[in-house]
């Protein structure tokens, strides 16, 4: 009996160690409500797009770029340049710009180098900001809400699955949402409202 229990314990442990595979909801409706995304995928390389498959997506991680005034494409091109400069390993699945533009750098089924231990099961979004406060302007903010809500729909998530880089590592990122907890709660609330609207018409 002990042996049987022991074997079961081993079996359960092995089952837990096996992560769920990547899946996403697909439908004409989901495609129709997708925000406008400029797909500018990085060249496959070990420094910013290593081609490592993600597991089942269980969260969305919000970052800020920490380079005030830079555009989404500026940040995308920085990630692209790492294949030559080899300065560090860094990237993001999406970058939201100052005009509300959304640039995709890495497919959601591939791991981006953004959120440390959560790279393997999250989608990362870098967000541009105009000044040192890290506060997002209205165009950026609205696109962040729209993108997060759409990703929640796509991966069966809700606003509580949207987290900050800070929540993973303690890093002050995104700065404004770490320093203003009320603004962070408001953002998550806005994502929830948008998600419910998307679900209404599904």
Language model feature labels by segment:
Residues 1-4:
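Short, small-residue-biased leader/transition segments that mark boundaries at the very start
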Residues 8-116:
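N-terminal catalytic cores of peptidoglycan-degrading enzymes
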Residues 9-37, 130-202:
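Basic/polar, cationic surfaces and motifs that engage anionic cell-wall
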Residues 55, 87, 118, 133-141:
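Solvent-exposed, acidic/flexible segments
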Residues 61, 124-126, 163:
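Soluble periplasmic/extracytoplasmic beta-strand elements of cell-envelope proteins
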Residues 65-66, 118, 123-132:
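Cell-envelope and extracellular/periplasmic
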């Amino acid at each position: 009996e002990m042996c049987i229990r022991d074997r079961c314990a081993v079996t359960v442990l092995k089952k837990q160690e096996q992560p769920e595979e990547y899946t996403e909801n697909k439908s004409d409706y989901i495609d129709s409500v997708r925000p406008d995304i400029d797909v500018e995928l990085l060249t496959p390389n070990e420094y910013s797009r290593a081609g490592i498959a993600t597991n089942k997506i269980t969260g969305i991680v919000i970052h800020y770029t920490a380079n005030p005034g830079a555009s989404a494409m500026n940040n995308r091109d920085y990630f692209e340049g790492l294949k030559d400069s080899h300065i560090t390993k860094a990237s993001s699945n999406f970058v939201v710009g100052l005009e509300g533009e959304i640039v995709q750098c890495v497919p959601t089924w591939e791991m981006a180098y953004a959120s440390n231990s959560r790279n393997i099961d999250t989608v990362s979004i870098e967000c541009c900001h105009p000044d040192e406060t890290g506060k997002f302007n209205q165009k950026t903010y609205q696109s962040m809400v729209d993108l997060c809500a759409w990703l929640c729909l796509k991966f069966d998530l809700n606003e509580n699955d949207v987290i900050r880089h800070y929540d993973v590592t303690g890093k002050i990122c995104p700065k404004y949402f770490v320093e203003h907890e009320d603004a962070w709660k408001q953002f998550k609330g806005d994502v929830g409202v948008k998600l419910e609207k998307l679900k209404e018409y599904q």
